[in-house]
């Protein structure tokens, strides 16, 4: 098949080019140079521009903006609980860090636009690429689409934006990783691994010796033993479990003669000859085996159902407590598999403080899980069903809200449809974390909406920009790329440098909170992953979530702001 024939097929079926851009973009994004890759988003943008140049498919704007709205709503829904939690007094330093980093980045971008006379399209790509926030590219393009210019100018500006984004994105990610993981620790004169160890030790510090009822974090093991140790005769289950507190052992069932006791309470008494079902990590089981008695194969007891559940923390009185405080006296028979806040996995340390909206992945007996749900919030029972009415209604309200405008000195000001959908998504996610009656969107569905919504939008943008990219490159030449790269370096580093100075000298944030806070304020998950890898700990995730949620909103809103600034500076 010739190129001309293939082009005819693509014009008849433009969806071929759309999905081909995603496929090729994946492989382009996987190409590594010194362990640094572009990532799927930028790879798809580049692939889309190439395919758009070759075949010039026509992708309906309806498809592009519909997927982008789904992406924005999913981002807002996920970040909502953390965003509103950042408004609390104890989170104000982290929120201040995010505001300063993102605002400094915007100020640097405006300065670069004024210096190099970038048009609105190049300005939009400069912000989205340098600050690695693809949502800002979409919100800026939405503003460009609303500009009062002819179609040829609008098409050229729309092509300039992804070109600038792809040019500045590489240093936007790599430069921030180097700054946060190498430069900043040297300036602060700290060792990332030592900082992590000290933070973990502080989180694990226990203030109460009665730790028999602390969350177990190890793989679960079930064993049955015949009680043969006379010292344990007539002891309560609570006393028995305290004896093996270091091993975190829980009695979940007893066979006494022909009688089978399930959901055993802590005040139940043991007797010689009982067959005891214990659940524990391996160390606890081994310790019990040495003292309790002979291990037996009681299949009926071993079939005791242990269930897994995701419990969302919604109770106000539990928010702000540490895992140790929650567990003490309330976690018997529960095993904490993981703890999540938004997209971040938190360390399962006794000093980790929880917030409303956090998700506990627990394993335990049905009774223990039910008790935990009453104490913490609610169980996500139907995790496979999405409330489509809530989702679609949220997008509708967001678009209408974004259309509202006020006039300031004759200039119309508003969030725009993109900003409106994002803000409504934030409120929707926050409301669900407080009142989980309607509006459930499971985490896998949110991830799918976010990933597919963004990647389809980026592919469509690339395909539309491809035919005009050659004109932009021809007109600007090497000088344009040099200006973009230089401006991108300034915008990428301006915010983190300001954040480092503010966080260290004014806010007095410890490095374990400051460094991931800078990564979150620049909305770069790759930097957090690099920080956790170099530091050898998940403890850095704690300082990431609040700045990430705040800056996700702010930098997305910077899209139309930078477009407006570029228009004003061009006059």
Swiss-Prot record:
Keywords assigned: Cell membrane, Membrane, Transmembrane, Transmembrane helix, Transport
MF annotations from Gene Ontology: monoatomic cation transmembrane transporter activity
PROSITE patterns attached to this UniProt entry: RCK_C (PS51202)
Any one GO CC term of the record: plasma membrane
Superkingdom assignment: Bacteria
One Pfam entry name: Asp-Al_Ex
Compartments it resides in: Cell membrane
Boundaries of every RCK C-terminal domain copy: 294-378
Bilayer disposition of the protein: Multi-pass membrane protein
Protein name as catalogued: Uncharacterized transporter BPP2141
Organism: Bordetella parapertussis (strain 12822 / ATCC BAA-587 / NCTC 13253)
